Amino acid sequence: GRLIDFVEQKEVWLDQIEFLVIDEADRLLDMGFIPSVKRIVRFSPRKEQRQTLMFSATFSYDVLNLAQQWLFEPVTVEIEPEKKTNADVEQRVYMVAKADKYKLLQEILRDEPIEKVMIFANRRDQVRKLYDHLKRDGYKVVMLSGEIAQDKRLKMLDQFKNGKHNIMIATDVAGRGIHVDGVSHVVNFTLPEQSDDYVHRIGRTGRAGTRGVSIS
């Protein structure tokens, strides 16, 4: 948003750039930033006249569609992610009926020595539903997903970082790149479909030599 403001105020010109880098394209898509990125792309030279690099952890149909729009004769490079889990994280699994999952989550939040906990769900609607339930029941909770305006999202992230709220609910894409000290627990309310997403999730705890707990 700030870059667009500078361009529109004639403080910055993008029409002569040679390189355009679009990082975390899937996250930009999930967080609702693509309209802003499209405006920036329109300010830059045509794709045939610039070199564009686009990075993404996942390549959904929507991400590939963006690549077709923005890249000229692209070369694809795929890197296999490391799938090892952190030995400092204790991993637990509870077999429970779907109808009992929320009750079990409440027991975990009550009984575990939680400093901060990140709860992951696969879809934005699941994040919203879980957030509404926990907030209704009096928990100090924030959520991170693409449906939230950026200013509110940053405010919620600050509340989690400074400990004002000790529960964060997030999707995989929205939670990527979030590094918060003092996360003692990670809860997979819904298990991810990809193993590397699982590794990434539980990597939010057990950092810098500390012990962590992952519960699925």
What would you call each of these model-derived segments?
Residues 1-216:
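Conserved helicase RecA-like core
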